[in-house]
Amino acid sequence: MKTAFHPTDLAGIQVRPSRLWTQSLSWMLFIVGVILYAQLSIARHKENPEDRVVPSARQLMDGVKASVLEPAEEDDPLDPSASLSERIRHSMLWKDTVASARRFLIALALLVPAILLGLHIAVFPYFGAVFQRFVLFFDKIVALSLLPILFIAFGIDEWSKIMLMVIGVAPTLILDTCNIALAVPREQIVKAFTLKSTNFDVAYRVVLKQVLPQIINSVRLSLKPLALFLFAGEMIASTDGLAYRIAIMRRHMGMDIILPYLLWVALLLFLLDALLRFANRRLHPWYQPL
C-alpha cells in the first residue's frame, strides 16, 4: 500500500532529482541573487538617481566598458583610431589581470616543492624527524604578520607578494599532503619492498600515485587562500593588479568597477578550479571529487 506523498520526501537521502531538475535548481540561487540585487538597486535609485553604492545595470555596463576598453588613469590615453584588440590589450582590466595572474601562477608553481616535502615527511622517517615539528609550528604563524618582514627582506616588488602567498599556503599544504600519504596502508609499502622496489619507487610510484588525486583536490581548495594573500599584498603595496584596482576604486566609491572586478576574479578562480577538476578526472577516473 502506497503512503501519501509529503513535501519533506523531496529532501530524502535516497531521492535523486532528474538531470533537468538538477540543472534548474543549481541556477536558482544565482537567479534569486540577481533579482534581490536588482530590487535593491531600483529602490536606492528611486531615492537617489546618482547612487553609486548599488549601481544600476546601465552603470555596471559603463563600468565594464571602461574596464575592458579604456586604459587605467595612470596610463597614457589610447589613440581614438585604435582597434578593438589593441584597446583590450591596453585596457585597465587586461593590465591588472596579467599582473595578478603572473604572481598567482608563480606562487602556485612554488607550491610543488611543498607537496614533495609533505610526501617525504610521510614516507621517509628522517625527513619527518627533521621537518615535521617545525612545519607544525610554522603553520600556526599568521602569514600576514610576516608581511613587514617580507617587505624588508624582498622589498615592495613582486617577490614580497609571491612569498606571502607561498608562506601562507605552503605549511598547510605540506601537512595535508603528509596526512594523505600517511593514510596509505603500510602493507602496500612492505609488499612493494618485497618485490625489490627501491625507495624512489615506493615514494613516487606507489604512494604518490595513490595520493595524487587527493593532493590535486587539496590544491583546488587552496586557490582561495592563495587569492586572499595575493589581494592582501596588492592592496598594501602595489602599482597594478586586480586587488590594487579594487582598493583604488574604493576610495572613489567606484562600485561600478569594483563589482565587475569581483565577479571577474571569481570567474577566473572558478575556471582554474574547473581545469584542475577536469585534469584530475582525466588522470584519475576512479576518483570523483566534488
Q: Which residues does each predicted region cover?
A:
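Transmembrane alpha-helical segments of polytopic membrane transport and secretion proteins
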Residues: 1-29, 276-290
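N-terminal signal-anchor transmembrane alpha helix
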Residues: 18-46
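Transmembrane alpha-helix signature in integral membrane proteins
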Residues: 80-120
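Loop-to-helix entry region at the N-terminal start of transmembrane alpha-helices
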Residues: 95, 99-103, 152-173, 213, ...
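Generic hydrophobic transmembrane alpha-helix motif, especially the helices
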Residues: 131-170, 179-180
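Transmembrane alpha-helices
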Residues: 163, 167, 200-233, 260, ...
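Short cytoplasmic-facing helical segments at TM-TM junctions of multi-pass membrane proteins
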Residues: 172, 176-218, 246
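C-terminal transmembrane helix and the adjacent membrane-cytosol boundary/short C-terminal tail
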Residues: 182, 260-290
